[in-house]
Structures are given as structure tokens and as C-alpha cells.
Design a protein with these regions (language model features):
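Bacterial Sec-dependent N-terminal signal peptides
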Residues: 1-26
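Surface-exposed cap/linker segments adjacent to membranes
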Residues: 23-61
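LRR N-terminal entry segment and analogous cap-like coil->beta motifs
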Residues: 57-107, 120
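Leucine-rich repeat
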Residues: 67, 89-94, 110-118, 137-142, ...
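Conserved positional slot within leucine-rich repeat
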Residues: 74, 98, 122, 146, ...
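Consensus "Asn ladder" position of solenoid repeat domains
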Residues: 78, 102, 126, 147-150, ...
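The feature encodes a structural signal of leucine-rich repeats
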Residues: 84-86, 105-110, 129-134, 153-158, ...
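Leucine-rich repeat domain C-terminal region
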Residues: 167-177, 183-247
């Protein structure tokens, strides 16, 4: 007689029940569920730095708690494998989300409308595919967005120019295409821009950005594309502008 398999839901319930005994009212049950499902969906047993569920959540690697809310999640370079579960949207008080340097697959979570307090999103150096969610403009407090070194495709969402507090935008080494959205000049605080090694076809939207005091601009333009004239007139701030031969 075969031993019946224990379903994922039961395992999660068992883990949740055990963890809640030790949570000491640190965070809400909703947030505990989100953390445990992230662990389960990304092979937590293989993580470089694992979570000891017998210990308070505030001691878990990469988890930052403030006033009873999870405000920071930094699991960078921690051997996460798999996909980001939709329940991560339960961490609505997150200010920092850093899952860079792992092997996370699937799409960028389209849950940005729930993360109103996010200031930093770093999902670089993974295997994420698909488009950048159109709801990204909901992150009105975002200061850093790093999606470099993935497999993202499609065009940049038009609303990305509405991220008025953004200081760093890093999208290099993907398969993004089409024009850079107009209105980038509204991003008054943008200091670091990385767009190299994509398939962008029109850089005219960067014309007014070149007048800002950009500390670092990394743009690779394919041969045959037009360069905004202001780049040649006001090269200060441009640290890298290269030409790549059309394949």
C-alpha cells in the first residue's frame, strides 16, 4: 500500500502553524503565509542562507521588520530557484525587494499596484522573461529599479516616465525593443541610466534627459539609429555611448 503524498497546502499549513507559535505577534498571518510560500516556491531547502522557522521571523535571513510589518526582503545571491508566487503581493508594506543574483524564472510579478511603498526593486541577474508590467507606474515612491541581465522582451511601458522619484533605472542586457517612451524628462531625479544591449529603435525621448546631471549613462546604439542631437552638444554626464554593428 502506497503512502499518500502530503499536498503542498498541507505542508504550508503545517509550516505556518509551527511558525505562528514562534511569531510572537511580530507580523500578520498574511505576511507569514507570503514568506513561507515564497520559500516553498523557490526551493527554500536549497537556499544558501535558510530560514529557521523555530526562531523569530525578525531573525530570518534578509527579512526586515518595522512596527510589526515586513518592510524589507533581501534574498540576493541566495540560490532561489523557481517562480515568484502571487502571494508575495501580501507583503504590502515592502520598501525594499531584492531578489537579484538568483535563478528565478517566469514573469516579473504584475502586482506593483499593491506595493505602494516600494522604494527599491532589484530583480537583476535572474531568468525572468516576458514584458515589464504596465502597472509599474503605480510605484510612485520607487527610487531604484534594476531588471538588468534577464530575458525581458517587448517595449517599455509608457507609464515608466511617471516614476518621478526614480534615481536609478537599469534595464541593460535584455531583449527589450521599440522606442524609449516620451516624457522621460519628467524623471527629474534620474541620475543613473543603463539601457545597453537591448534592441531599442528610437532614442529621441532621451533628448531632454541629456541636459540633466546624469552621473552614469550607459546606452548602446545600433548602427543606423539616430542619436539625439543634444547628446553631441552636451556630452557631460555621458560616460558611455557606444555603437554596435547591426547583425
Amino acid at each position: 500500500m502506497k503512502t499518500p503524498k502530503i499536498g503542498f497546502s498541507l505542508l504550508l499549513f503545517m509550516g505556518l502553524s509551527f511558525t505562528m507559535l514562534h511569531a510572537q505577534n511580530e507580523v500578520s498571518q498574511r505576511e507569514v503565509i507570503a514568506l513561507l510560500e515564497l520559500k516553498a516556491k523557490t526551493k527554500g531547502h536549497l537556499w544558501t542562507n535558510q530560514w529557521d522557522q523555530s526562531q523569530p521571523i525578525s531573525t530570518w535571513h534578509g527579512v526586515t521588520i518595522k512596527n510589526g510589518k515586513v518592510v524589507g526582503l533581501d534574498l540576493s545571491n541566495n540560490n532561489l530557484q523557481g517562480r515568484i508566487p502571487i502571494t508575495i503581493g501580501n507583503l504590502r508594506h515592502l520598501e525594499v525587494l531584492d531578489l537579484s543574483g538568483n535563478n528565478i524564472e517566469g514573469k516579473v510579478p504584475g502586482l506593483f499596484r499593491k506595493f505602494e511603498k516600494l522604494k527599491v526593486v532589484n530583480l537583476a541577474d535572474n531568468a525572468l522573461a516576458g514584458n515589464i508590467p504596465t502597472a509599474i507606474h503605480k510605484l510612485q515612491n520607487l527610487e531604484e529599479l534594476n531588471l538588468s541581465n534577464n530575458r525581458l522582451e517587448g517595449e517599455l511601458p509608457l507609464g515608466i516616465s511617471e516614476l518621478s522619484k526614480l534615481r536609478t533605472l537599469a534595464l541593460a542586457n535584455n531583449d527589450l525593443k521599440g522606442p524609449i517612451p516620451m516624457g522621460m524628462e519628467k524623471m527629474k531625479k534620474l541620475k543613473m541610466l543603463y539601457l545597453a544591449n537591448n534592441k531599442f529603435s528610437d532614442f529621441d525621448a532621451l533628448r531632454k534627459l541629456s541636459k540633466q546631471q546624469l552621473v552614469m549613462t550607459d546606452v548602446m546604439v545600433k548602427e543606423g539609429n539616430l542619436i539625439p542631437l543634444d547628446f553631441t552638444k552636451s556630452p557631460e554626464g555621458l560616460s558611455r555611448l557606444e555603437f554596435e554593428k547591426q547583425e
